[in-house]
């Protein structure tokens, strides 16, 4: 889910 990516953005 996109929300999951926003929760912990991997640099």
UniProtKB/Swiss-Prot annotation:
It is found in: Secreted. GO terms for cellular component: extracellular region. The modification Valine amide is found at residue 11. Coiled coil: none annotated. Keywords: Amidation, Neuropeptide, Secreted. GO terms for biological process: neuropeptide signaling pathway. InterPro entries: Periviscerokinin. Pfam families: Periviscerokin. Belongs to the periviscerokinin family. Mediates visceral muscle contractile activity (myotropic activity). This is CAPA-Periviscerokinin-1. It comes from Praedatophasma maraisi (Gladiator). The lineage of its organism: Eukaryota, Metazoa, Ecdysozoa, Arthropoda, Hexapoda.
